[in-house]
Every structure is written in structure tokens, then in C-alpha cells.
Amino acid sequence: MNDDDTWVALLHRPADPSVAGGVFADPRFGDHVAFLQRMAEEGYLVAAGSLADRPGEGMTVLRLPGPDRLDEATRLATEDDASVASGFFTVDVRPWRVVMHA
């Protein structure tokens, strides 16, 4: 991968705020984990995890090789993640202009 890669931050939150504290116990959370595993297998996953100050919310960083792949990243996040497609999570797909990384 090079500096022309497409980076995105995916910000996930429960569609129903009442499940925020128990999101990890909900069986639909497994769909989200499966999505993250597929992204790792594709080599796109940089990092993923819950936000310590926001129960039930999380962030995922994806890096897709090549420029101009935001539409593909959006499709992956909204259609390929069954936890989003089913309405369990909402997701904000944010293009990320990375200026420095290790």
C-alpha cells in the first residue's frame, strides 16, 4: 500500500440507544465481528474497537489500496456489515486524510 490509499474511519453506534450498555451481549454483535474479520482477511482493517467514553459506540479504521475507493468503503460498511444492514448499528463513513503514520 502507498500514500495514495483510501483511508476511512467508520463510527458505529447502536441504532437503539437502550442497548448501548449491552451491545456486546446482543447476538447481532456477532455479525459486526464477522464483518471485521472479513476486513482483516482482505487486508483492509487497520484497527477496530469500542470508544471508552461512549458505551456501545466504536470506531474502525480501514485502508483500501489505491485512491478514490470511498464509494467501495461505504458499500462495505453499509451493506457488507450485516449489523448495519439490519439496523442494529448505524455507521458514519468518514474519509480520513492521513498525513503521518508509522
Where are the language model's segments positioned?
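Conserved, structured core segments of small domains
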Residues: 1-102
